[in-house]
Amino acid sequence: MLGSVLTRRSSSGSDNRVFVYEVEGLRQNEQTDNNRYQIRNSSTIEIQVPYSRMNEEDRRITRLGGRIVNIRPAGENPTEDASEN
């Protein structure tokens, strides 16, 4: 019984959270050709990432030569951050 409690996935709010990664420096190559979006070397792109996949996505972006410049919750307006500074 204790084992089943320990292996059961948590149904906390973190399972439903989504974040937006702002990424720069990704290069278009054979691996990125499989993405649903085009990569432009001169600009940043935004990628929606579920909380449960953040670590994997961080590694993938680094492996592809990108750099994460900002992470924010998906529902947050990006202009709100700029007005606070």
Swiss-Prot record:
Membrane topology: Peripheral membrane protein
InterPro entries referenced in this protein's UniProt entry, alphabetically: CpcD-like_dom (IPR008213)
GO cellular component terms listed in the entry, alphabetical order: phycobilisome; plasma membrane-derived thylakoid membrane
Superkingdom assignment: Bacteria
Coarse class of the protein's main subcellular location: membrane
Keywords: Antenna complex, Membrane, Photosynthesis, Phycobilisome, Thylakoid
Annotated GO biological process: photosynthesis
Coiled-coil annotated spans: none
Positions of transmembrane segments: none
Subcellular location: Cellular thylakoid membrane
Domain CpcD-like: 16-74
Pfam families per the UniProt record, alphabetical: CpcD
Role, per record: Rod linker protein, associated with phycocyanin. Linker polypeptides determine the state of aggregation and the location of the disk-shaped phycobiliprotein units within the phycobilisome and modulate their spectroscopic properties in order to mediate a directed and optimal energy transfer.
Family classification: Belongs to the phycobilisome linker protein family.
Protein known as: Phycobilisome 9.7 kDa linker polypeptide, phycocyanin-associated, rod
Species of the source: Microchaete diplosiphon (Fremyella diplosiphon)
